[in-house]
């Protein structure tokens, strides 16, 4: 990679190298603009569900969106970006009693339901989110978090063959991610408890596993979902091919 001698703060990520999100975020120049040249134009559709599949679109997306966690460029350890957390766990053999006010989305009856008594989980992670404004000026809030969990559960569960919330690529992936989620309990306007059946000797890895976040406003995800359910587009490339519709892109 070639870097102008007047550019400082280039980060050589041990995994991603110089083109990681840390370089454009950390770089300093004598100008107000930072010019970055790429070899090819992006190839993946511009949607955060099953688009952004190539290196170049991922590099752009990594600059203009925030994850809830990320990996340290030199150590590979998980660190917080959009939330602080506190992990409670006693290992694989001991369980935590989940409070009955905790909820989970039920895709069969299409509503949030409280968990039953005597519900247990391996770990509890309390997330204190760092909300700010979306690019359109709207303030982030708990609706974005809850809708993200709804979306993952709804699309990760195929009720029957006529289920419209099914994608050939995304549904199997979402189904795997929801297997260990037990419940979510909203504490206040920016704090939730997430209960999971997962353990790791590093508590930050438990937090990353339990993390619930949305890179876009919930309204945007809902609009994309409606377009897909109406049969106009598909979240994934294979879904678009099988249904003979366009691969959903928010900018084309």
Walk through the language-model features, giving the residues of each:
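The feature preferentially marks the first beta-strand/turn patch immediately downstream
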Residues: 1-252
């Amino acid at each position: 990679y070639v870097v102008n001698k007047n550019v400082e703060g280039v980060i050589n990520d041990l995994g991603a190298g110089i083109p990681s999100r840390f370089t454009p975020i950390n770089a300093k120049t004598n100008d107000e603009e930072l010019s970055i040249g790429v070899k090819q134009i992006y190839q993946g559709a511009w949607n955060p569900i099953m688009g952004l599949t190539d290196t170049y679109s991922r590099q752009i997306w990594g600059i203009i969106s925030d994850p809830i966690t990320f990996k340290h460029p030199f150590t590979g350890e998980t660190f917080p970006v959009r939330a602080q957390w506190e992990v409670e766990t006693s290992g694989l053999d001991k369980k935590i009693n989940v409070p009955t006010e905790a909820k989970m989305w039920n895709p069969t009856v299409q509503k949030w339901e409280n968990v039953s008594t005597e519900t247990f989980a391996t770990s509890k992670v309390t997330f204190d989110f760092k909300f700010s404004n979306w690019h359109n000026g709207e303030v982030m809030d708990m609706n974005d978090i809850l809708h993200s969990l709804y979306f993952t559960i709804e699309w990760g569960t195929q009720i029957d063959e006529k289920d419209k919330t099914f994608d050939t690529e995304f549904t199997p992936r979402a189904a795997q991610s929801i297997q260990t989620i037990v419940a979510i309990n909203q504490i206040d306007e920016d704090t939730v408890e997430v209960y999971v059946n997962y353990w790791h000797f590093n508590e930050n890895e438990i937090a990353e596993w339990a993390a619930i976040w949305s890179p876009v406003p919930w309204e945007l995800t809902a609009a994309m979902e409606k377009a897909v359910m109406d049969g106009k587009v598909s979240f994934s490339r294979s879904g678009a091919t099988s249904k003979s519709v366009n691969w959903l892109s928010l900018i084309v």
